[in-house]
């Protein structure tokens, strides 16, 4: 029989009304662990959800990697690059690549009777993965975009629609400047999307690849570039290095040079900001572990002092300091365990409530999302539980040495 464990279970399970000091101390220590763990779970799940939601929105507008003309990736101007079947097949055969799609960008002005707005038209074709657009559609539908003909239909954001007072099904004129000539086009608004990523929502419209290429006066096999989706975002740099060796610095038949950049290189400020959130998480984890540790230390010291008489009796019966220390560490383990159970119920419960109801709202103009995004990561939650238990027990080792300073004769007479 494990003697320290047996004694600890008897002490912990005993309902002793005389222990007016230790009972509240146990409850406070348990609550400290529970609240600390709950805050850690909520913080980690919210930060993970926020990072992945914002990342997915940025990736939705530009995929993981872009292969384009060298000058296009270095400046704000659009330079054409050949994107024929041979190059597309070459990109698709690259290890780690999941999907390849062409795109062409052009600038224009949307004009109504009362207002006008400069926007960026993104031309896309049949192979374009519209999953991201579907997820963010709020009105209308996505037309069948083509690289063979113009459907004269566009998708606009809610931001643009509100500013120009446009609705689905209405027609709007767009004006494009080409070779010092103004080229008007009339489009039908097929649908309206909203991502809350303001830097894109303010300017981005979707139309046919054919339309964008023609408006830029490019050849049929030219485009702004290709967007590549990789199988594993964590290995995007590794996949891009293959393009650097395989595609970059090669020249197409028009004399243009291929180059590539990852979405992190194209949007460094956003991804640096997201990386900084990890620092906030570590600060929160450290603070909550400290709170749990302090409450456990104070709780254990109170229990040891109140059980001085019992410690003296155990020593008189032959129990050594190590055995008694182990007894109180087991007692602390029970307190921590109960705190972990309550903390998991509270933390996971709040996260589940937010995930399925979206009860906690945010200002999308500031945070890019309308509700607090959360993401369950059960392996990480398990690691938080284990780490909390281990760290709390480690910090309790030093206070437990107080037992070695308790003298049996004096402590037996202590009441």
Name the predicted role of every residue range.
Residues 65, 160, 221-244, 259:
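A short beta-strand structural signal in non-transmembrane regions
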Residues 51-85:
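Membrane-interface junction motifs in transport/secretion proteins
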Residues 21-48, 275-310, 333-342, 390-394:
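Hydrophobic alpha-helical transmembrane segments of multi-pass inner-membrane transport and secretion
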Residues 81-221:
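A structural signal for hydrophobic secondary-structure junctions
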Residues 338-384, 397-401, 405:
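Short helix-loop junctions at transmembrane helix boundaries
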Residues 16-27, 239-242, 246-291, 303-305:
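Peri-transmembrane interface segments
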Residues 301-303, 310-354:
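Transmembrane alpha-helical interface segments in multi-pass membrane proteins
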Residues 401-415:
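Short cytosolic juxtamembrane segments of multi-pass membrane proteins
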